[in-house]
């Protein structure tokens, strides 16, 4: 079941869903708007291959900054963070969606990582890309996306109890930690 405005507010007021900082005006009929944080990470353009199983190649030739505004250039991929830190109970999951007004500028908010598991605690890393033909300026604190909350049965092992919860507790834009996964290919 998707939570509606009063259910979102009720769960936040009772501490079942935690959002810091919380702004009641960001609650929408079926979602909670989230804002852009001020930490940004991107890969320096080049020919170096990124191997997801090799931590050094994942973390090499990366730039990052904290700023109140950032320009995303055509074709550029950038990681960012949400201003909000989220804490989900073991029976609520969330999905992140872009705001239509931002999408109409050519900004994709997430590539495929739009699912937030029950038990997750942390800021959300955004995988942004500009598919417009023109640069787009964005500001820390601007509403950029929305979280849709779903109730589920209680997870037997929520994300916060998993031994391999790679992104639990993250507080800034976080590079891929795929290299920490067990390797299944031959």
From Swiss-Prot:
Which residue stretches, if any, does this entry annotate as coiled coil? none
Alphabetical keyword list: Hydrolase, Nucleotide metabolism, Nucleotide-binding
- The superkingdom of the source organism is Archaea
Which residues are listed under the site Important for bifunctional activity?
A: 114-115
Any idea which GO molecular function terms this record carries?
Answer: dCTP deaminase (dUMP-forming) activity; dCTP deaminase activity; nucleotide binding
Disulphide bridges, residue numbers? none
Where, by residue number, does dCTP bind? 99-104, 117, 125-127, 146, 159, 166, 170
One Pfam family linked to the record: DCD
Q: Which is a GO BP term held by this UniProt record?
A: dUTP biosynthetic process
**What function does this protein fulfil?**
Bifunctional enzyme that catalyzes both the deamination of dCTP to dUTP and the hydrolysis of dUTP to dUMP without releasing the toxic dUTP intermediate.
Q: Which NCBIfam families match?
A: dCTP_deam
Assembly notes: Homotrimer.
Descriptive protein name: dCTP deaminase, dUMP-forming
The gene is: dcd
């Amino acid at each position: 079941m998707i939570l509606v405005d009063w259910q979102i507010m009720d769960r936040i007021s009772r501490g079942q869903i935690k959002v810091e900082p919380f702004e009641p005006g960001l609650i929408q009929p079926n979602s909670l708007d989230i804002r852009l944080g001020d930490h940004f990470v991107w890969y320096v353009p080049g020919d170096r291959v990124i191997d997801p199983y090799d931590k050094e190649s994942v973390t090499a030739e990366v730039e990052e900054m904290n700023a109140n505004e950032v320009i995303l250039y055509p074709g550029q991929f950038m990681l960012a963070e949400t201003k909000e830190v989220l804490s989900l109970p073991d029976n609520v999951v969330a999905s992140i969606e872009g705001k239509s007004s931002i999408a109409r500028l050519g900004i994709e908010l997430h590539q495929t990582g739009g699912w937030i598991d029950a038990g997750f605690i942390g800021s959300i890393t955004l995988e942004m890309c500009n598919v417009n033909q023109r640069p787009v300026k964005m500001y820390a604190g601007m509403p950029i996306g929305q979280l849709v909350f779903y109730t589920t049965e209680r997870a037997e092992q929520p994300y916060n109890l998993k031994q391999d919860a790679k992104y639990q507790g993250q507080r800034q834009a976080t590079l891929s930690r795929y290299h920490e996964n067990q390797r299944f290919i031959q």
